[in-house]
Amino acid sequence: MGKEKIINMIKDVLKQDGRIIFAYVFGSFIKEESFRDIDIGIYINNPDENIFVISSDIKTQLSIMAKKEKLDFSADQFDVKVINDAPFTFLKRVFKEGLLLIDHDPDLRTDLIEYVSLKYRECAGILTEGSSI
């Protein structure tokens, strides 16, 4: 099964959800030939909404679409994370290694990337020092 087909299916589902501003796929699905799950990071327009409900809704929609497309994926194989309040170290990894799937507000996304990059540079010495302990 081709990754491109899976990526297109994920894009189609995410485009239909008006709560999502931008989304990335990242992790082993992007970096390795074989993978156990598909990590998806979504930035939503209302972070006060219940992120577990949003994540569950999207996982359900992805599994329904996967079944229609004859792809062998269950909802549990989609790991959907709301990234609005994620730690900047995690966001750096998503932005650096991930593949952008949808982007309804490029200015917001690039502002967040710049903010994460700045925060990472500010704390790089502390992070390096802490990892050598």
Region locations from a protein language model:
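Catalytic core of pol beta-like nucleotidyltransferases
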Residues: 1-22, 30-33, 49-133
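A short, glycine/Asx- and small/polar-enriched loop/turn
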Residues: 34-38
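Short hydrophobic/aromatic beta-strand micro-patches
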Residues: 41-45
